[in-house]
Amino acid sequence: MSAEGKAGRPVVIGAYGTGRKPCIQAPDSSLYTVLVRNSDYLTLENLEVVNTGKQRMANRTGVKVLCEDYGVSHDIVLRALHIHDVNGSLIKQKGGGSGILIVNRGKDTPSTFDGLRVEDCVIRRCERNGIIWSGYSNREHWHPNTRTVIRKNLIEEVPGDGIVPIGCDGALIEYNLMRNCPGTLPHSEAAAGLWPWSCDNTVIQFNEVSDHKAPWDAQGFDSDYNCRNTTIQYNYSHDNDGGLVLICNSGTDPGAGNQGSVVQYNVSINDAIRPRATRSGIFSANIHIAGPCKNTLVKRNLLHVNPKTEPFIDRSIITSDAWDGYADSTVFRENVFFVPQESEIRLNRSTRNTFDGNYYLGNIKGRPEDPNGRNVSDYYNRCISKDPSGFNSLSFLFDTVVIGDGSAILKAVNRDTIHRFFETMKEE
């Protein structure tokens, strides 16, 4: 479909009246169920979308939004869609598959989205990914999408990447829940929850990611390469095979690198629990910095580690390692690292790391010089005294928010409460 509405008077395509959402089901060999192409001021809402083939097919998706040789596509809105059972490829290099695929390109006319929104959708049992883009990534010909908002969506039973904006400037990813990820990806595959690629000024906040089981990575959040000024804040990560966050840069990529990432006021409980070897051996650091990332700030995050279920599971709180280079000028400030078992910080050959005022609550090997660091906190001990796992005892840090179709509850970090928590930690 293609349609051109006007600002304030969009073309609306969706259900009306009462009853169940109308269901659109693709033919067996279709790459998409719904295609929105070269449109302006269009809203697609209140529909059920299915694309299940007899066999898996690479690049299969539920809803595809395309802007091609069109210029600027304004205010496309996907709202309250239930997209499910899309059996794409599980392998990224073969094309993968997704619930929603957003594509902007143009041989003759650079084409972008301005004001695209995806909100209140449910994406369930879609393979490989949830919401993913294909946009301009080459910095020499970078035409970013603007005013992108992805808000209050439920992504569940999706094994791969949850939400991945590509080629955007100023994307806002907030109040989304990714959970119940099946461990069905092949051993070669890497994936994580919410992360940008080839983007600037992305804000990822007030989201919750749990149960990620990708064979490699599997963090709740990721500040990826060819990105500048990514902010990951006020998020809740728990029960992921990987840790809270990956911050990475390929040292051989000619793009923008990874500059100015900020990771702050996030809560991680029982992450980094991978019970099997990755393609590089046993590994599941709570914070993983890979490659020559520059000027990263990791500030006031709460990492509450629970006992590992097997002795061979990785116990690294922080690992900074190589990806054709090492990180430089990373600051860790006033974070809480709670560990019930011996753990480790591995900085390897990364340079100019600064640790200032962090809390090392437990036996942590490789602790760096931190003149303002602390080894004990009576306040934190009181917080978790009735529930050492942290799940109930730290629940005061969260609000509950209804998202998706109204049946899912998101735990969103409360901004004021977590600020008070860290001030209390500092003042005791």
List where the protein language model places each region.
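Extracellular beta-strand-rich solenoid/capping regions of secreted or surface-exposed proteins
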Residues: 1-12, 23-74, 93-109
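Short, recurring structural edge motifs at helix starts
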Residues: 67, 105-108, 138-139, 193, ...
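Short glycine/acidic-rich loop motifs that flank beta-strands on beta-rich extracellular proteins
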Residues: 26-33, 53-61, 87-98, 127-133, ...
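Short, solvent-exposed loop/turn elements at domain surfaces
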Residues: 21-23, 411
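Residue-level marker of regulatory loop/turn positions in helix-turn-helix DNA-binding domains and
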Residues: 36, 70, 92, 110, ...
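Right-handed parallel beta-helix
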Residues: 10, 14-19, 40-51, 72-87, ...
